[in-house]
């Protein structure tokens, strides 16, 4: 049974919707690729949960990228996913990072870029500065700018588990936001330990036991890297053939490493010759 799931829920007595995501296996898969500092482990967990919530909220078919960049010790943290809740991620850092480092201490002067690439239609990109207190507040600002919908986000991660909640006024509903303010106040009382140990139904009962809540069927969230030998070969082929041949002469082979999952793809002289002759096969050995 998959222990990484996202639930949507809606209030029958208010024009408000919500989501809850709880992650463990996919989170550990992302962390296993590199030995991340403690603070960065937590940030990656929050970013995973956030991307899952965003993907479920912004109804579209295609790919999503949530990327943080800055001039601090952490230069990049990115989660890529799609509407099927398949996620992968990686971060780059340099130097020591305190275990309790804040978002600004990790990224310095930075920004968040959310990119939606639908299967059909034009790509959309939204940018928010990282000058808010935490990642959740940055995402709330994104929704304020892009959709102008009152939104509350809660994110938690501890290096082992990650979880998040999203509460939002339904699109096309306007006027009195008293219901949202009331439900937002209830949601803000959630504790990390509750999201890590209780199932979605128990969490919603604890928060909203006096409300009329409908919980929808869960959606699995999974880690899967999209790297492949064919993609690595295509990347090599973008280089001038003379440059590739020089590397081969010096190294005897060309190795491509995936940052996301640490898979290695090796190409020897025979592979490279086949690649440029058009007879390259993805069945070659890694």
UniProtKB/Swiss-Prot annotation:
Description of post-translational modifications: Under oxidizing conditions two disulfide bonds are formed involving the reactive cysteines. Under reducing conditions zinc is bound to the reactive cysteines and the protein is inactive.
Main subcellular location of this protein, as a coarse class: cytoplasm
InterPro entries: Heat_shock_Hsp33, Heat_shock_Hsp33_C, Heat_shock_Hsp33_N, Hsp33_helix_hairpin_bin_dom_sf
UniProt GO BP: protein refolding
Keywords attached to this entry: Chaperone, Cytoplasm, Disulfide bond, Redox-active center, Zinc
GO cellular component: cytoplasm
Intrachain S-S bonds: 225-227, 258-261
Compartments (UniProt record): Cytoplasm
GO molecular function, one term: unfolded protein binding
Superkingdom classification of source: Bacteria
Protein family: Belongs to the HSP33 family.
Function: Redox regulated molecular chaperone. Protects both thermally unfolding and oxidatively damaged proteins from irreversible aggregation. Plays an important role in the bacterial defense system toward oxidative stress.
PANTHER family per the UniProt record, alphabetical: 33 KDA CHAPERONIN (PTHR30111:SF1)
Name of the protein in its database record: 33 kDa chaperonin
Organism of provenance: Shewanella frigidimarina (strain NCIMB 400)
């Amino acid at each position: 049974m998959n222990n990484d799931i996202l639930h949507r829920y809606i209030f029958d007595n208010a024009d408000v919707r919500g989501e809850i995501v709880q992650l463990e296996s996919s989170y550990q898969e992302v962390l296993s690729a590199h030995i991340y500092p403690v603070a960065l482990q937590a940030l990656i967990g929050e970013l995973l949960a956030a991307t899952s919530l965003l993907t479920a909220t912004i109804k579209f078919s295609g790919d999503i990228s949530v990327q943080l960049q800055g001039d601090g010790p952490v230069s990049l943290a990115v989660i890529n996913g799609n509407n099927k809740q398949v996620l992968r991620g990686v971060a780059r850092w340099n130097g020591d990072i305190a275990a309790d480092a804040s978002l600004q201490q990790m990224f310095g002067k930075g920004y968040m870029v959310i990119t939606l690439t639908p299967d059909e239609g034009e790509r959309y990109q939204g940018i928010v500065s990282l000058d808010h207190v935490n990642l959740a507040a940055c995402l709330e600002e994104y929704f304020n700018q892009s959709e102008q919908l009152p939104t509350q986000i809660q994110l938690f991660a501890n290096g082992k588990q990650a979880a998040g909640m999203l509460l939002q006024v339904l699109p096309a509903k306007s006027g009195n936001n008293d219901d949202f303010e009331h439900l937002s106040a209830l949601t803000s009382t959630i504790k990390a330990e509750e999201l890590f140990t209780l199932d979605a139904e128990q969490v919603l009962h604890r928060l909203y036991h006096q409300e009329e809540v409908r919980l929808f069927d869960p959606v699995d969230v999974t880690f899967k890297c999209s790297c492949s030998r064919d993609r690595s070969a295509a990347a090599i082929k973008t280089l001038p053939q003379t440059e590739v041949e020089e590397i081969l002469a010096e190294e005897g082979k060309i190795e491509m490493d995936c940052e996301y999952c640490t898979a290695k793809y090796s190409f020897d002289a025979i592979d490279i010759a086949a690649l440029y002759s058009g007879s390259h096969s993805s069945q070659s050995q890694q």
